[in-house]
Curated annotation (Swiss-Prot):
Isomerase found in the keyword field: yes
Entry cofactors: NADP(+)
Protein name as it appears in the record: ADP-L-glycero-D-manno-heptose-6-epimerase
Origin superkingdom: Bacteria
Cofactor note: Binds 1 NADP(+) per subunit.
Lineage: Bacteria, Pseudomonadati, Thermodesulfobacteriota, Desulfuromonadia, Desulfuromonadales
Organism of origin: Syntrophotalea carbinolica (strain DSM 2380 / NBRC 103641 / GraBd1)
């Protein structure tokens, strides 16, 4: 059996779909469906069971084996709202929760794959998986960086796989429940359908209008990385998961406009509350990921957004 936490969320539900495509249905999905709209992400999935996160944690704490051999825990469950400033809530959901699962897995030699984030780098300009480059700009990034630091301390004595993935700007199907935290491609499409135009921020930090650059990665490529590590339980560590190629927000906007054959691009003032807390540039250093043996390719913004817009039109 495989356990996917956050399995009704964005990346987690895409992992479940990919496991189904492999013929796997022995999947326990763990999530918090307080936001009931997330059910849509797993309504078409084939799973063996569902557990609420709180019940799951109670059973983990009691040492429950869940009645079956656990092949791996793929931990995607977390609070991913970068504008959330309730530090106690964030540390409980992202740090303490992850530590509990990590030790459960280590004690039973169960592979543990988990979601970290490029938010650990914050305002830095070097995106290499080393502590000196970690400068989080918000408590979300800090919660992820702190758990990565914890993992580094236990890895030397771990007898089973522990692999963390620093996701960069992920976009694609099944993110509609994320609201303000959904990708820029998702929001631009909604703007275009509503107003016939799309809005980007004016320039900041020395970048021109819409020229801020991020490493945008299609969710299907993120899933491929997770499944590669699932297939290679001998590989542990913390890895960047991006394309290794930054592109501009203008690139995303033009890809959305192209998919809909028209529309206007406008620029709006940069929000005051984001100044000093905004990553104007990210680009994953993939040296460590490639060195681990992953040789998969990644879609460009143009390719990924086109695929995503087609999926949205069909669903």
């Amino acid at each position: 059996m495989l356990i996917v936490t956050g399995g009704a969320g964005f990346i987690g539900s895409n992992i479940v779909q990919a496991l189904n495509a492999r013929g796997r249905e022995d999947i326990l999905v763990v999530d918090d469906l307080t936001d009931g709209t997330k059910f849509a992400n797993i309504a078409d999935a084939r799973i063996c069971d569902y557990l609420d996160k709180d019940e799951f944690l109670r059973r983990i704490a009691s040492g429950d084996s869940f009645g079956d051999r656990i092949e791996a825990i793929i931990h995607q469950g977390a609070c991913s709202t970068t504008t959330e400033w309730d530090g106690r809530y964030m540390m409980e959901n992202n740090y303490a929760y992850s530590k509990t699962l990590l030790h459960y897995c280590l004690e039973r030699r169960i592979p543990f794959l988990y979601a970290s984030s490029a938010a650990t780098y914050g305002g830095g300009q070097v995106f290499c998986e080393e502590p000196q480059y970690e400068r989080p700009l918000n408590v979300y990034g800090y919660s992820k960086a702190l758990f990565d630091q914890y993992v580094r301390r236990v890895l030397p004595t771990a007898d089973s796989q522990v692999a963390g993935f620093r996701y960069f700007n992920v976009y694609g199907p099944r993110e509609q429940h994320k609201g303000s935290m959904a990708s820029v491609a998702f929001h631009l499409r909604n703007q275009l359908l509503k107003d016939g135009s799309v809005n980007l921020f004016e320039g900041c930090d020395g970048y021109g209008d819409g020229e801020q650059r991020r490493d945008f990665i299609y969710v299907g490529d993120v899933v491929d990385v997770n499944l590669w590590f699932l297939d290679h339980p001998e590989v542990s560590g913390i890895y960047n998961v991006g394309t290794g190629r930054s592109q501009t927000f203008n690139d995303v906007a033009h890809a959305v406009l192209k998919a809909h054959e028209g529309g206007e691009l406008q620029y709006v003032p940069f929000p005051e509350h984001l100044k000093g807390r905004y990553q104007s540039f990210t680009e994953a250093d993939l040296t460590r990921l490639r060195g681990a043996g992953f040789d998969g390719s990644f879609l460009t913004v143009e390719e990924g957004v086109a695929r995503y817009m087609e999926w949205l039109q069909q669903n």
